[in-house]
C-alpha cells in the first residue's frame, strides 16, 4: 500500500503538471486544441513499437541499457515512417487547411520527439521498477519544472504551438541527463539474448499497444466527423479521461513492484487481489475529484459549460480500467503478453463498432464517453478467463 501511495502522489503531481502543459496548448486557439488532439492520437500509435524495449524489460528486469537501445532504434524507425507518410497521415483527419498545416509542421520533427520521449519514459520506468522512488520523484520534479518554465516562456513570448512541443523535447533531454547521472546504469549494447527476449515478450506487447491505439485513432477520426465544436468537446473530455488514467496507472505501477514478490502464479494472483481490495475506494474517489480539477485546468478556449454532462460519462472509464490493470499486471508478470493482444483486439473492436453505430445520433458524445468503460472492462474479462484456463491446464508454476 505504501508503494501505491508514494507512486500515486508522484502521478498526481505528473497529471496536474501535464494538465498545465495541455492548458498552454489549448489557450492558443480551438485549432490548437484539435491539432494537439490529432497529434497525440498519432503519437499513441507510433510510440507503441518505440516502447518495445521497456515493454520487454517489464518481464526480464535486467540489462537495462540493452532494452533502452531498442527504444531508441525503434523510435528512429517510427520517426522515419511518420515523416515519409506525413501527407497521408495529415489527411486521415477531417481538418481545416489551417489545422492540416499546423499538424504537418509538428510531424516534421516527430522522430526527435518520439526518441527523446520514449528514452525518458523508459528510464523513468526503470527507476520506478527498481523501487528507487525517491530518485523517481526528484527526476519528475526536474522534468516538470523545466517543462512548465519553458512552456511559460514559449507561450508568453510566441504563442506558437510548435515551440511548445519543442519545450517538451528539451525538458525530456534535461531529465534524461539527470536520471542517467544519478542511476549509473551499466552501459551495454543489445545482444542476441536481448533480441530474443524482445521478440518473445516485447513484440506481442507492442502489437497489442499498436492495435489498441490504431482503433483509438479511428475513434478520434470518427469523432472528428461530429463537427469542430463537438470534436473539440470530445478532445477536451477525452484528454481529461487520459489524464485520469494516471491514477489507475499508479495502481498498476505499484502492482508491478509488489506482484513479482510472489514466486508462484497463485501468490502473484493473491498479491493482486489484496492490493485491488485495498486501493479500490481511494481510486474511485480520486477519479471523480480530479475529473473536475483537470477539466477546469485544461478546457482552454472551450467554454467549460459545454463539457457538461459529457465529462461524467467519459470519467466512468475508471470502472473498466481498474480490473483491466489488475489482470494486465498478472499477464505481464507471467510473460503471457499474447493474452493482452487477444483481450485488446476484442475490446477495441467493440469500442469501434459502438461509436460507428451511434455517430450520427443526438447522444453521440454520451456514447463516445461510455465506450471507454465498455472497452477496458471487456478486456479485463478476457484476461481473467484466459489466465484462469491456463492455470487450470498447469501452464503456470502454482
Please report, for each region that a protein language model flagged, where it lies by residue.
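Hydrophobic alpha-helical transmembrane segments
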Residues: 138-153, 157-185, 365-389
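Signature of the first transmembrane helix
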Residues: 1-51, 203-226, 239, 376
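Small-residue-rich hydrophobic transmembrane alpha-helices
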Residues: 26, 33-78, 121-128, 231-287, ...
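Alpha-helical transmembrane segments of multi-pass membrane proteins
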Residues: 38, 97-123, 244, 301-327
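Alpha-helical transmembrane segments of multi-pass membrane transporters/permeases
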Residues: 7-8, 62-69, 126-153, 165, ...
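Hydrophobic faces of transmembrane alpha-helices in multi-pass small-molecule transporters and flippases
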Residues: 1-16, 107-111, 134-141, 178, ...
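Interhelical loop/hinge segments that connect adjacent transmembrane helices in multipass membrane
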Residues: 1-4, 99-102, 161-214, 390-398
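Short membrane-interface helical motifs at transmembrane helix boundaries
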Residues: 77-104, 282-309
Amino acid at each position: 500500500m505504501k508503494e501505491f501511495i508514494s507512486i500515486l502522489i508522484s502521478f498526481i503531481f505528473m497529471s496536474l503538471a501535464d494538465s498545465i502543459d495541455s492548458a498552454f496548448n489549448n489557450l492558443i486557439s480551438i485549432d490548437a486544441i484539435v491539432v494537439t488532439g490529432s497529434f497525440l492520437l498519432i503519437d499513441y500509435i507510433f510510440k507503441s513499437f518505440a516502447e518495445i524495449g521497456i515493454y520487454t524489460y517489464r518481464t526480464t528486469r535486467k540489462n537495462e541499457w540493452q532494452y533502452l537501445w531498442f527504444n531508441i532504434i525503434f523510435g528512429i524507425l517510427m520517426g522515419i515512417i511518420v515523416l515519409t507518410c506525413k501527407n497521408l497521415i495529415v489527411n486521415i483527419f477531417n481538418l481545416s487547411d489551417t489545422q492540416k498545416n499546423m499538424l504537418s509542421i509538428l510531424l516534421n520533427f516527430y522522430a526527435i520527439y518520439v526518441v527523446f520521449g520514449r528514452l525518458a519514459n523508459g528510464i523513468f520506468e526503470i527507476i520506478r521498477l527498481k523501487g528507487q522512488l525517491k530518485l523517481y520523484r526528484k527526476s519528475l520534479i526536474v522534468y516538470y519544472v523545466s517543462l512548465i518554465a519553458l512552456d511559460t516562456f514559449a507561450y508568453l513570448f510566441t504563442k506558437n504551438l510548435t515551440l511548445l512541443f519543442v519545450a517538451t523535447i528539451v525538458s525530456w533531454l534535461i531529465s534524461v541527463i539527470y536520471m542517467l547521472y544519478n542511476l549509473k546504469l551499466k552501459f551495454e549494447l543489445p545482444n542476441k539474448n536481448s533480441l530474443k527476449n524482445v521478440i518473445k515478450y516485447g513484440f506481442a506487447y507492442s502489437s497489442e499497444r499498436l492495435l489498441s491505439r490504431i482503433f483509438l485513432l479511428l475513434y478520434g477520426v470518427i469523432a472528428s466527423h461530429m463537427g469542430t465544436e463537438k470534436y473539440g468537446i470530445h478532445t477536451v473530455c477525452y484528454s481529461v479521461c487520459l489524464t485520469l488514467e494516471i491514477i489507475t496507472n499508479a495502481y498498476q505501477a505499484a502492482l508491478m513492484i509488489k506482484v513479482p514478490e510472489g514466486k508462484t502464479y497463485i501468490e502473484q494472483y493473491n498479491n493482486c487481489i489484496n492490493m485491488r481490495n485495498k486501493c479500490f475506494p481511494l481510486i474511485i474517489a480520486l477519479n471523480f475529484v480530479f475529473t473536475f480539477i483537470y477539466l477546469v485546468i485544461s478546457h482552454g478556449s472551450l467554454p467549460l459549460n459545454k463539457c457538461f454532462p459529457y465529462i461524467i460519462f467519459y470519467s466512468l472509464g475508471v470502472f473498466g480500467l481498474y480490473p483491466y490493470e489488475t489482470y494486465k499486471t498478472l499477464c505481464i508478470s507471467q510473460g503471457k503478453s499474447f493474452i493482452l493482444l487477444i483481450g485488446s483486439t476484442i475490446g477495441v473492436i467493440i469500442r469501434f463498432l459502438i461509436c460507428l453505430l451511434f455517430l450520427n445520433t443526438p447522444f453521440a458524445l454520451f456514447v463516445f464517453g461510455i465506450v471507454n468503460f465498455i472497452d477496458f472492462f471487456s478486456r479485463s474479462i478476457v484476461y481473467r478467463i484466459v489466465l484462469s484456463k491456463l492455470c487450470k491446464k498447469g501452464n503456470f508454476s502454482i
